[in-house]
């Protein structure tokens, strides 16, 4: 699960809530707050891959979800789309957080092609609905991970890799919002890049140290499989760049990073931030988010839900929520 890969000192576990229909999956979650769906209507029997059933299960707990999100400035919803829980519950969670007054960012995975057209359809519908609700959506298609694996990579390792990439995005945005910098990026800046029902967003996080850390970070960013996919999607409309380093960060390093990235995305609106932290002594970390405005199709997909690793998570400074199952 993505939740397991986010565990660590950087993001306190007290900020996580795990949501699932399966009691066994919840018992393995290390979060303090947990919501088990289906204890009433379906008594923990799952969703059978049906998003409408997942939505019905979540409706039973909607007040509980709103209560968790009250007095939270920002809520991260982390989920896999495609199945009953991810597709049915994720948009409802996002709506509950919005109704509680929080700003909402969704981080989602979509299914591999081999998972079938049914799960892909549910994922597309859920993603479309999420874009109408959340302040920003970052989506990682699992299919892109095939660029990183070979024919000997096991199924378990492949899913671990996709979860790791999504966790990387969550940590990158967390740092961006939590490290108050010399040049700050505000939530409104982030939402401006990610918002829009007809936009598609891509991300990469890279880190390096040593004398050539800028060159190394740029190389890692520009060869990141998700950004390579972004380049194939057409002109970039906006790019957000966040740099975090120790007190040894120089103006020349900042200028070089910005020049390289701005040169790669000519014509894009550029938003940048820079922070120094003693936790990043001798290290340079760069988070890059880019957004494309997609052509409007004549027939929009019907809004609805979808997932491949499914566990919504609710989040406060920000608070996080993840769905855990693949039902």
Annotate the PLM regions:
Residues 1-327:
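Tubulin/FtsZ superfamily GTPase core signature
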């Amino acid at each position: 699960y993505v939740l397991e890969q986010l565990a660590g000192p950087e993001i306190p576990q007290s900020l996580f809530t795990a949501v699932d229909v399966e009691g066994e999956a919840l018992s393995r979650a290390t979060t303090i707050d947990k919501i088990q769906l289906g204890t009433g209507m379906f008594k923990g029997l799952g969703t059978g891959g049906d998003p409408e059933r997942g939505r019905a299960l979540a409706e039973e707990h909607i007040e509980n979800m709103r209560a968790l999100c009250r007095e939270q400035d920002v809520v991260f919803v982390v989920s896999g789309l495609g199945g009953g829980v991810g597709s049915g519950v994720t948009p409802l969670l996002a709506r509950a957080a919005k109704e509680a007054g929080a700003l909402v960012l969704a981080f989602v995975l979509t299914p591999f092609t081999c998972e079938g057209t049914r799960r892909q359809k549910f994922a597309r519908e859920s993603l479309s609905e999420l874009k109408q609700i959340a302040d920003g959506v970052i989506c990682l298609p699992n299919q892109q991970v095939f660029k990183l694996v070979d024919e000997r990579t096991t199924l378990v390792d492949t899913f671990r890799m996709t979860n790791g990439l999504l966790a990387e995005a969550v940590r990158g945005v967390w740092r961006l919002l939590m490290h108050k910098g010399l040049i700050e990026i505000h939530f409104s800046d982030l939402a401006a890049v990610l918002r829009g029902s007809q936009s598609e967003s891509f991300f990469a996080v890279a880190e390096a140290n040593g004398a050539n850390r800028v060159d190394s970070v740029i190389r890692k960013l520009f060869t990141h499989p998700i950004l390579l996919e972004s380049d194939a999607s057409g002109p970039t409309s906006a790019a957000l760049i966040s740099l975090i380093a120790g007190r040894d960060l120089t103006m020349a390093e900042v200028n070089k990073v910005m020049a390289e990235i701005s040169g790669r995305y000519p014509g894009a609106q550029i938003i940048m931030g820079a922070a120094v932290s003693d936790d990043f002594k001798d290290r340079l970390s760069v988070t890059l988010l880019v957004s494309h405005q997609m052509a409007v199709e004549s027939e929009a997909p019907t809004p609805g839900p979808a997932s491949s690793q499914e566990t919504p998570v609710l989040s406060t400074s920000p608070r996080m929520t993840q769905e855990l199952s693949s039902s």
